[in-house]
Amino acid sequence: SGDGSMSCATCHDPERWFQDGRAVAAGRKTLTRNTQALVDIGWSRWFGWGGAHDNLWSPSLRAITDPDEMAGSVESIAHLIRTDARYRCGVQQNFALDATAADDEALFVAIGKAIAAYLETLISGPSAFDAFRAALMDGDVTKASTYPAAAKRGLKLFVGHGRCHFCHFGAPDKRRVC
């Protein structure tokens, strides 16, 4: 953050599947939406609340510079990269950028892309729903019938009135890919 008191993990807590469990997020100010969970976010096509971004690195940078979230700046991030040997070395090794010579914007974008690369590694394991979906796709009625009735009611809400599936659609079924 701008004053060094917050990191991404302040709101995207690894112990809570990279979100904070709050109804609304608390950045530098109380925000209007909850903290998005980051597990499986790499499967998304659009990013950020409302889908304003078509890549994963851009909303990461927006959160860093948003005055209500982390209140950082391009210059403060570039300064951190230049003065911290770990970050300086990482940028040089992964982006072939000399942090001492690169302009602030190039360093800032490199950090956004590094964050995005990390986020793409946050992949959940198979869930009960994944097994249910696979059973349906395979036509295995017996296996599909083991999915709990309460979960089926939740699924109806999820894909029906709740309209949750427009943003929370999960990973594609990799078994069906050529």
Question: Where does each model-flagged region fall?
Answer:
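Periplasmic c-type cytochrome electron-transfer domains
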Residues: S1-C178
